[in-house]
Structure formats: C-alpha cells, structure tokens
Amino acid sequence: MIFLLFVVFPFVYAQLLPELLAGFQNGRFRGGPDGFNRGPGGFHRGPDGFGGDPRGGVDLGHLIGNIAANVGQEMGLNDADVIGDLRGISRGPRPSSMEWGRRARHFCRRYPGHPKCQRGQLPQFTDVPTIINTIIYNAGDLLPRVPTLNIHDPLAGLNSELVGFIKSLQSQFGQLSSQQRNEIHDSCRSFKCDQQSPQNTQAKQELLTKMLAFDQAVGGKAAPAHDKVNLRFDRTQQVKQALLKRANLSHIIVPADNGVFDRDVLLTEHQANFLLNELGEAGRGADVGAGGGGGGRVPRSGVFFQESAVQKWDIWKPIQYTLDDSLEESDKKDIRDALHEISINTCILFRYNATPKGYHLNYMKVDSTTFCGLSYVGRTDPANPIYLSFQCGDNRGVAMHETMHALGVSHQHLRLDRDKYIKIDWSNIDPQHYDTFAISDAKLYTSYGTKYAYDSIMHYNAYLGAKDPNKPTMIPLVNPQENTPKLGQRAKLTRGDIRLLKKMYCRPGCDDQNVHCGTWALHGYCKMKEQMKWMNENCKASCDKC
C-alpha cells in the first residue's frame, strides 16, 4: 500500500550523477521528458472516468478500476517518484521556472529536512546533482521525523522467572551473530547488494498506483493525499534499512525498495513507526509544519491488536468483502472457496457486498510476477485491500494466506521460537531481502500457545529468497527429509492454523493479557505450580482455560 519514494542509494549515484554532470558540461540535458512512464502496465485498468461515490451505491469494483485509469494522469509526469522525476528532467530541455518550481515544491514536501528546503527556500535546477547525492546517503534524516511512541514493556512488573525465561529466548529484533553477518557479507562479493533492481522500481510504482486508486475509491474526499501514501512506502523502506543497520550491514546492502515488507506484508504508517521505535530510530528526521506527514503520538494499543480489540474484526456479524472488476470469474471462485474453507473450520463468517460500508476486505488482481499476494496484518482503516496476482499456482491457498494476514496472523517462520525448528542458510539468502528472515519483534505477535507447524499455510517455502534456487534457505531441524516439502504448502488450512484462528476469534472473553503468553504456555508454565495461578488468570487463551 505502502507503498513514491525512491529512497535512493548508491545505484542511483552510479547511474544518474554522471549523466547529470555530462548534461551540465554540454550546457543542456539530453533526451526529452516523454520518457516518463505515465502509468504502469502491470495493473488492470478500468474505463475512463472516476465514476461515483461508493457510498452512493456505485459498485466499488467499477469505481476502483475507473480511478486507477486516471491516477497516472493525476500524478503528472511520474510526480509520485521524486527522484525518477528528476532523472526525466535531466534528460530533457531545461524546464520553465514555473515547471521547476512545482517539482521543487513537491521535492521539499517529500524531504522537508533537505538543506535546500530550509527557511522557505527551494532548490534550484542547478542543484539537481547535489540533491541526488544528499538523498543517497541521508534520506532518513530528510524525511518527516519518526514520532516517539509510548510503547508498553510487556515484561514490566512480572515475576522474575517469567521475565528471565523470555529474555533467555529473545533475540534482539534484527540482530545477527558475527558468523551470520559474515556469511551475508561474503554473499555481497558476488551479488549486487548495493544496486536497486528495475523490477523493484517497477513493482513499487505499480503498487503505488493501485493503492492511490483504492484510497480514493474507499475514502473519497477523506482519502490521504499522494504525499501521505508515499510516506507509508518511505517508512517501510526505513524499517528495512534500520534492520540492516541493526545487523551492521547497512554499509554494504541496499534493501529492496519495492514498498513491501517480508515479501507480502504491507505496513501502515503507524505499524512502521512502531517498528522504527523498536529499532532505535524514534526521533530521526525533520520537523514539519501542521499537516506534515510524520507527526503525532500513537498509543501501543493502536499498533497491531494483541493487546487491544481495536484491530480485531467484529465477528459477531459476517465480515464484509467485495470483489474488484479486475478479477476473472475463476479468480472470484478461488477467493470464495478460500473464505468458505475458513468459515467451515472456524466461527468466522464472510458476506459479499458490492457496495460495502465500513470495514471490509477488498480483493483485487494485480498482473505482477513479483509477488503472489499482498495484505496488511490486522484490520485497517477504512478497509483492507488484498492484492492477488493469480500467477503462483494454488490460488485458493494464496487467497487464504493473505486473508489470514488480514485477520491478524503473522508468518510462521518469523516466530520467536523459529530457530528451534528451522535453520536459516544465511549464505544463500538474497541480502536485499534480509527483512524476510529477521525474526519478528517479540512484542508484536503471539502464538496463543499453538505449536510451530512446518505445514502451516502461513509458512514460506524452503527455497524462498535463495541466491541459488537449488539450495534451500530454510532447513527443518526435525526430520528435514519429511518436513522440507511441507514448507510453503498452500493446499489447505492445517490443524494448527485452525486452532490459532479459533483462539483469536471464537472464544468470547477468553483473551491473553500479555503478548508472551503463548511462549510461556508452550514451555509448560500454565501447569507449573509457582506460575499456574497467574498464568490461568492472565493467559486464558494460551492456557486453554475457557
């Protein structure tokens, strides 16, 4: 969603700066502005015209398609991609003062901390090389400041034994051992770790177009402006950069700037800010005036839903869903079958509505080979878009996987206890996708006492993100010959998947009061005499006490 936002790195320096300097030496820039991509071809486009307001009864699937067709024109010459915009200008004739002023103002909205944007000033056209160079090395300092959040410590005031046990298991979010770091470092000797691929750039631009169309269709006049949508993508990239910084790898690796976290997860701005706080990035960036993109305090309960019912779906009535016009009839059947499998195995019901009001799931097709599906984790405001490519096989299973994300379920292989069950071959991972293998922050997700399952529909396959596709990146530590083929299955919900959903949604009043309850339950604390009373009172779901 989030997506724009080329937070540019050394590859831009290598490719753009010589080109710009040559333009200056010749007294003009080469080429013409017509090289800009006015609209990604990878997304389904609807007919011309915006259509009406979905709240007025217009089919939401039609509306999103109509808006998507116009987003490119509304954005102008790649206006959402500031650096790409500069690149296009550098190849054409010198723009008029009015045209350059418009682009310079847009740049300063995106990067309010840039030295050329201070005290009401704007960069000049001759500043283009300096602008690019500054962003390459200091983008995080130029974006709106990361807000400092009041994050509750779930271990505060607890029994020393419970605290000590969690700390003995807890690996610091994003941390690597020296051996693991060296293995990744060695990979970069033969892998272009400091260059952004064109595929990432294209995927991000396509996703931005789709997300802008969705926000406009669902939010109407209340939809966030382009800069606000762009900031989600900037924050996502900042999280990936911060993870590499924590692992002491940021000086050699440029994370994939594709707008996506962990291959198929979209981060809201609040979720990204939470992760940045956990990674020590709170307060980084520039102050912006009223209406700026990054301010405001967000309470802990507003980010993910383990400690708050706010982000959970109300399942006392069916969850509304709608199907975009981009979907073929066979695609719609796969989605309906996926929702049916969830419903027959749990208490969660779904109801189709062509003109949904309020929170709902919105399924859309994206003609992309870069991902199978994308979704937010947990319920989002005003609705949850779920993007599916239908190009990976097991379409019904992929739809279930992404719907599970929307219901609030994280990936199996990022659990706190992951390293007890699988071994990551750090020497074979794509270093630019390090976020795919970094164990989740322990404060965010709970297992609800369900055991690690190799066959979970929420597990990735053994070869995901591999440099050498013939070698696995994830190797089961228990019976690898039998369990390796199970990783990444999308045929059905497993017993563990169903049990987790039931604990999350199907036991009214049976809640955990601490995000670590699932971990304690799996290690027998529900039945230990010294901890039994506290566990049974505070970890009812994980201890199966209701």
Curated annotation (Swiss-Prot):
GO terms of molecular function: metalloendopeptidase activity; zinc ion binding
Keyword Metal-binding tagged: yes
Residues carrying sugar: 248
UniProt-listed Pfam families: Astacin, ShK
Domain of life (superkingdom): Eukaryota
Keyword flag Hydrolase: yes
Cysteine-cysteine disulfides: 347-506, 372-392, 510-546, 517-539, 526-543
Gene deletion effect: Defects lead to embryonic lethality in 6% of population.
Cross-referenced SUPFAM superfamilies: Metalloproteases ('zincins'), catalytic domain (SSF55486)
Propeptide segments, given as residue ranges: 15-300
InterPro entries in the record: Astacin-like_dom, MetalloPept_cat_dom_sf, Peptidase_M12A, Peptidase_M12A_astacin-9/10/11, Peptidase_Metallo, ShKT_dom
Domain Peptidase M12A: 308-507
Catalytic class of the enzyme: hydrolase
GO biological process, one term: proteolysis
Domain ShKT: 510-546
Cofactor(s) needed: Zn(2+)
Binding positions (Zn(2+)): 401, 405, 411
Entry function: Metalloprotease.
Protein name per UniProt: Zinc metalloproteinase nas-9
Protein encoded by which gene: nas-9
